[in-house]
Each structure stands twice: as structure tokens, then as C-alpha cells.
Amino acid sequence: MDIKIYTQDGCFYCDQMKELCKRAEVEYETIQVTTQEMNALYPKATSYPYVIIDGEEIGGLIESAKFFLKEGLVSANKG
């Protein structure tokens, strides 16, 4: 699985996305971008992090968490 996380400095939700990947025990690549770079790469991206998995635009943290749940990479159990 090829996971790219587009981030900005000081982004709390970006850190949460990285934690989700660690919890799921999947490798990921972080790519720091400016807003201008992000707009040029992925015009429909509206927030950070912006996650691409196997070339598919997944979206932000919530969409990525739903994807991980659907794929069985993490469970909804809290403990």
C-alpha cells in the first residue's frame, strides 16, 4: 500500500494521521507542501492532511480513518 500524506508545519490533524498509520502498522510518506503547491497538485484538496493511497485521493483525516476501518486496518474499539 502506497500512502502519501501531504502536510504543513504545525498541523495537529496531520500528526493524528501519522498516528493512525502507526496504529495500523502501515508505512507512509509525508510530503510538506505550501498552500500554493497543494492547490497546483490537488485543486480539490480543502484541508490538511490530504491523503493519497495507491494513487487514489482519499481526503483528510476523517475520510482516511473511514478508509482504514473499511479495509480492516484498524478497529473502532477504543482500548
Regions inferred by a protein language model and the residue ranges of each:
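Thioredoxin-like thiol-disulfide oxidoreductase module
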Residues: 29-46
